[in-house]
Amino acid sequence: MKIIFNADDFGISPGAVYGILESYKKGVVKSTTLLANSPAFDLAVEVAKENPGLDIGAHLTLTFGSPLLQGLETLTDDDGRFRKNYTALENGLADVDMGEVERELTAQIKKILGAGLTISHFDTHHSIEPLIYPIQHKLAEKYGVSIRRHADVSDFGAIKTPDLFETAFYADGVSFETIKKIVQAHIGTNDVVEVMTHPAFIDETLREISSYVEPRIKEVSILTSRELQAYLGQQEVEVISFRDL
């Protein structure tokens, strides 16, 4: 089997940037996805350019912060900010202009490309793929990238994806044992499994803007541990990135 440890939320805070960098340089993370509207976007771009082996994707969002474009009336609240989570977006989906969705996601992609980075894959913040999949599919074809294989989406066409997407390494599931269970479920197969991760060093920015905070430093510890790397080697698990699909 092969595993992609993808680090979501690149750029959400300086601590997240450096936590992901640590998990790449000393650990098993080879891919990360960048929030184009994030507070530490410029720092993330700088770090990405200094570490060209780190595979960069776009962490497309309609549920974090503010959009890059103005005038998106069906995607924002009275303060001009996105809805705060999947449920809020889903509940208002009937009123959402999908043209606005496509324009905003395109702007996010173009901002990352315009910063001089190459994108290999797309995923979404708060796993909103099922709500916007036709547009994500269209943009993935347009830009020639891979996408995350969300369980609630079945028709990927010619777009490359991992075979499976594992979300168990999150919150109370952040443990070495969780990764071992994932490996044991697929060992001896040709499956390519993406494991979602959110490593970060905790800082005030992260505390102010994210509800998922404390487990992130534990993720860094596990993803950089010699124990994990030795285990993956013993099980002959190949750690790859989205570039390798």
UniProtKB/Swiss-Prot annotation:
This is Carbohydrate deacetylase. Probably catalyzes the deacetylation of acetylated carbohydrates an important step in the degradation of oligosaccharides. One of its GO terms (biological process) is polysaccharide catabolic process. HAMAP family: COD. Its EC number is 3.5.1.-. Mg(2+) binds at residues 59, 125. The lineage of its organism: Bacteria, Bacillati, Bacillota, Bacilli, Bacillales. Belongs to the YdjC deacetylase family. It comes from Listeria welshimeri serovar 6b (strain ATCC 35897 / DSM 20650 / CCUG 15529 / CIP 8149 / NCTC 11857 / SLCC 5334 / V8). The keyword Metal-binding applies. GO terms for molecular function: deacetylase activity; hydrolase activity, acting on carbon-nitrogen (but not peptide) bonds, in linear amides; metal ion binding. Keywords: Carbohydrate metabolism, Hydrolase, Magnesium, Metal-binding. Its cofactor is Mg(2+). Homodimer. SUPFAM superfamilies: Glycoside hydrolase/deacetylase (SSF88713). It is an enzyme of class 3 (hydrolase). It holds the Pfam family YdjC. InterPro entries: COD_ChbG_bac (IPR022948), Glyco_hydro/deAcase_b/a-brl (IPR011330), YdjC-like (IPR006879).
